[in-house]
Design a protein with these regions (language model features):
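Long, hydrophobic N-terminal alpha-helical segment
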Residues: 1-39, 63
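N-terminal beta-strand motif that seeds the catalytic metal site of vicinal oxygen chelate
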Residues: 1-17, 74-83, 133-136
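Short, structured motif recognition centered on aromatic/hydrophobic residues
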Residues: 5, 12, 22, 46, ...
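Intrinsic, low-complexity N-terminal interaction/targeting segments
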Residues: 30, 36, 54-67, 100-116
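C-terminal "cap" of GNAT-fold acetyltransferases
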Residues: 36-52
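Vicinal oxygen chelate
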Residues: 44-45, 81, 90-136
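Short, solvent-exposed interaction modules
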Residues: 69-95
Length: 136
């Protein structure tokens, strides 16, 4: 079951250059910054009411975010939906013929379990399913 829009992921070239707009101009509280080595990104989470904004900076030219920025420029990368039982939800979607980028959840920022749906199954939108750590 989808519980909420967990966050909106935005690809950026530099957190140092981008963060002041969000924290000083928009006055969004910075919740934290962490590196997700497996994805070759550094992420910053900001609180925006009931949801969050995730800024993603590539740490390597080989990262998916670096390739995204090179092809499309900076901007909205994905919408993350908070779910219960991510693996069960992935199995249901696969059975219904929905294309998945990952058939098995992996560990993402903050220890959350995450997996992406293929944009070709969702009108061109990249959706991430996200199960927060401790909410299994």
């Amino acid at each position: 079951m989808i519980k909420k829009v967990d966050h909106i992921g935005i690809a950026v070239k530099s957190l140092d250059q981008t963060l002041p707009f969000y924290t000083e101009e928009l006055k969004l509280p910075l919740l934290g910054i962490e590196e997700v080595e497996s994805e070759k990104v550094k992420v910053a989470f900001l609180e925006a009411g009931e949801t969050h904004i995730e800024l993603l900076e590539p740490t390597s030219p080989e990262s998916a975010i670096a390739k995204y920025i090179e092809k499309r420029g900076e901007g909205i990368h994905h919408i993350a939906l908070g779910v219960d039982s991510i693996q069960g939800r992935l199995n249901e979607l696969k059975e219904k013929g929905i294309r998945l980028i990952q058939e098995e959840a992996k560990i993402g920022a903050g220890g959350s379990k995450v997996a992406f749906l293929h944009p070709k199954s969702a009108s061109g939108v990249l959706y991430e399913l996200c199960e927060k750590k401790g909410e299994e």
